[in-house]
């Protein structure tokens, strides 16, 4: 009994903390018979007081202690590791910038953007609620009202002064300004509720578009940034060749359009899906929508959808606000549709760039269209109902359903296959239909002795005045009018393909006029045309938009059908207003070719610069009968002028070459 009671009095302390349990050791000694020599896996006899479990626990004690320490200070270790990585990256970036800043410019820009996002998020968490509380008293104050009117007055005076000073040197820029006024009057005349138009929203949207256009087109910094951005996008899209060449072969990728442009859609769709999964697309859309909402006074849902159209297509953007479409007003639905018709998606942007269209102009046109789409929509279909979404509180953008980046990339590529095949099918069908229409019109014209009657010719006559109001030179108007007509009645892909053909002819140094027919359009006309074609506003898009929105809110099919035609017309006007903005703001950039020294270089091939220099030389040349020709202007008294004339006559036919 004493021994038993003695055993009970011994405390069996735990070994979880690594301490020795004397009670357990004593019990093991008493149970084991004398003389026992049995050895455990570690070579220790049980008689020495160290059984298997006791020894293992004691041997694991340092590791348990270390693991416990790591768990306790895990956050500190992460911060230290993150700090070391940031220091290493900063050192790497500094070294790259010192060695060659131009080469490291892309990395520097990406780093600045990441820092901006992180600082913005930090300040929003730290000061966001405080700033909201501080600004809340001014929301309905008289000071805010006066501030709006003062800002509007200053903006109007600034616009008048700018137009007066800028157009003094180039009076032709007033023509597209009159074009903007013309399109605004047309939209107002077709407005659903004339008395309900919010002119603050209209002029705020047009003002934002104008200011952004000045930054992008006229300022050196903005122009350089978007030119650089366009070049980076082109370089990035060229990586598609690595995948398409492996699948189809180098020959097909270089020579066949379907294997050159369509894989870009798949690659870009994959990238957009990854960015959407990471939340970057939603973040940018929310910031753009917030800025548009506070400046224009539009509701949260319609602004989010229009801002989303900058990055995704007209069927994908409504998915951003899918839970709210059922409760949106007709004016808001009209704005959502207009935004889809007035812009292009990021995936299609890659295909247009593959055509050879200027990337920076496409990006600028897509961004500039967003505020103009909201303004034009509220002019054509003003709000007369009470919206439930005046504030963006409670309106959240959904995240992707994918579980990891690889799944997002795969789903994006697979989804883009449908878009790529849709583009290919549309090009095949619409080009065939256009050829048939032209053949039928030509046949009908020949019956009454009208030669060469085609769909393009009809558009060139009907739309020529409108195109002239966009700022296009009169000699270029027929060709631009053809493309605008093709874009609206056929497809924007066919129109951009035609534009790329004109651009390639110009760059190849082809003569501007051959047998009385113009072969290409000027650079100014190319830029204006790029803006005017940048949108999905064509007749075939009506079915696409109705089908996409009806699948989301089938109970509102009748409401969607009521506004879709008006939204199509409004979206087309948005693209034309953007083209007018480009016509006002565009000025020739870049140093002109030094034509006097240019002939000293080898005349190995024809280029646009060669043609322009030779045309100037032909205009400066005077024939003197049997005497050698004389030269005027910059070619006067130049020893090599005669040699340059001989070289130019080898490329181009001119009367002075006889």
Swiss-Prot record:
Regulation: Inhibited by formycin B.
Comp. bias intervals (Basic and acidic residues): 26-41
Annotated transmembrane regions: 80-100, 104-123, 148-166, 172-192, 200-220, 233-253, 260-280, 295-314, 336-355, 362-381, 423-443, 454-474, 529-549, 567-587
Coiled coil residues, start to end: none
Keyword entries, A-Z: Cell membrane, Membrane, Phosphoprotein, Transmembrane, Transmembrane helix, Transport
Subcellular location per the Swiss-Prot or TrEMBL entry: Membrane; Apicolateral cell membrane
Tissue: Expressed in heart and skeletal muscle followed by liver, kidney, intestine, pancreas, placenta and brain. Weak expression in lung. In testis, primarily localized to the apicolateral membranes of Sertoli cells and vascular endothelial cells, and weakly expressed in Leydig cells, peritubular myoid cells and germ cells.
Location of Phosphoserine modifications: 45
Role noted for this protein: Sodium-dependent and purine-selective transporter. Exhibits the transport characteristics of the nucleoside transport system cif or N1 subtype (N1/cif) (selective for purine nucleosides and uridine). Plays a critical role in specific uptake and salvage of purine nucleosides in kidney and other tissues. May contribute to regulate the transport of organic compounds in testes across the blood-testis-barrier.
This protein's name: Sodium/nucleoside cotransporter 2
Encoding gene per record: SLC28A2
């Amino acid at each position: 009994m004493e021994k038993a009671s003695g055993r009970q009095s011994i405390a069996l302390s735990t070994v979880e903390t690594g301490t020795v349990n004397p009670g357990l050791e004593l019990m093991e000694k008493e149970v084991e018979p004398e003389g026992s020599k049995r050895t455990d896996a570690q070579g220790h006899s049980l008689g020495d007081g160290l059984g298997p479990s006791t020894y293992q626990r004691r041997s694991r004690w340092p590791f348990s202690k270390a693991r416990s320490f790591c768990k306790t200070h895990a956050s500190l270790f992460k911060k230290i590791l993150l700090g070391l990585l940031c220091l290493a990256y900063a050192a790497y970036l500094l070294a790259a910038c010192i060695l060659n800043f131009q080469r490291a410019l892309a990395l520097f820009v990406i780093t600045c953007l990441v820092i901006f996002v992180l600082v913005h998020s930090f300040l929003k968490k730290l000061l966001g609620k405080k700033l909201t509380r501080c600004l809340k008293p001014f929301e309905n104050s008289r000071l805010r009202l006066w501030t709006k009117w003062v800002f509007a007055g200053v903006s109007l005076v600034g616009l008048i002064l700018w137009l007066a000073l800028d157009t003094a040197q180039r009076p032709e820029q007033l023509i597209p300004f009159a074009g903007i006024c013309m399109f605004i009057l047309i939209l107002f005349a077709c407005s659903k509720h004339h008395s309900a138009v919010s002119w603050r929203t209209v002029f705020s949207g047009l003002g934002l578009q104008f200011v952004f256009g000045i930054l992008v087109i006229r300022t050196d910094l903005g122009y350089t940034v978007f030119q650089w951005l366009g070049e980076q996008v082109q370089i990035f899209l060229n990586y598609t060749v690595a995948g398409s060449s492996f699948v189809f072969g180098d020959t097909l990728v270089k020579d066949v359009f379907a294997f050159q442009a369509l894989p870009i859609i798949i690659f870009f769709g994959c990238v957009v899906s990854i960015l959407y999964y990471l939340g970057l697309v939603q973040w940018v859309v929310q910031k753009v929508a917030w800025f548009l909402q506070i400046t224009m006074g539009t509701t949260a849902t319609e602004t989010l959808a229009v801002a989303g159209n900058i990055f995704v297509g007209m069927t994908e953007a409504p998915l951003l606000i899918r839970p709210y479409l059922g409760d949106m007003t007709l004016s808001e639905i009209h704005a959502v549709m207009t935004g889809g018709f007035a812009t292009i998606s990021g995936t299609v942007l890659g295909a247009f760039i593959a055509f050879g269209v200027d990337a920076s102009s496409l990006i600028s046109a897509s961004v500039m269209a967003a505020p103009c789409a909201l303004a034009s929509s509220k002019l054509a279909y003003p709000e007369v109902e009470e919206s439930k979404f005046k504030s963006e509180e409670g309106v959240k953008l959904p995240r992707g359903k994918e579980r990891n980046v690889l799944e997002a990339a795969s789903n994006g590529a697979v989804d883009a296959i449908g878009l790529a095949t849709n583009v290919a099918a549309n090009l095949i069908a619409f080009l065939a239909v256009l050829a048939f229409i032209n053949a039928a019109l030509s046949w009908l014209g020949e019956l009454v002795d009208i030669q060469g009657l085609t769909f393009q010719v009809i558009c060139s006559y009907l739309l020529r005045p409108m195109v002239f109001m966009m700022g296009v030179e009169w000699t270029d108007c027929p060709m631009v009018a053809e493309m605008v007509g093709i874009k609206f009645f056929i497809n924007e892909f066919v129109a951009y393909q035609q534009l790329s053909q004109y651009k390639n002819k110009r760059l190849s140094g082809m003569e501007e006029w051959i047998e009385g027919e113009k072969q290409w359009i000027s650079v100014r006309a190319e830029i204006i045309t790029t803006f005017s074609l940048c949108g999905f506003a064509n007749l075939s898009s009506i079915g696409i938009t109705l089908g996409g929105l009806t699948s989301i809110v089938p109970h509102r099919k009748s409401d969607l059908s009521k506004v879709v035609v008006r939204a199509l017309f409004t979206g087309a006007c948005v693209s034309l207003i953007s083209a007018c903005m480009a016509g006002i703001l565009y000025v020739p950039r870049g140093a002109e070719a030094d034509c006097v020294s240019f002939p000293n270089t080898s005349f190995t091939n024809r280029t646009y610069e060669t043609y322009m220099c030779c045309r100037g030389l032909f205009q400066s040349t005077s024939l003197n009968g049997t005497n050698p020709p004389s030269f005027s202007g910059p070619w006067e008294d130049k020893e090599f002028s005669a040699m340059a004339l001989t070289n130019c006559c080898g490329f181009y036919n001119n009367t002075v070459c006889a």
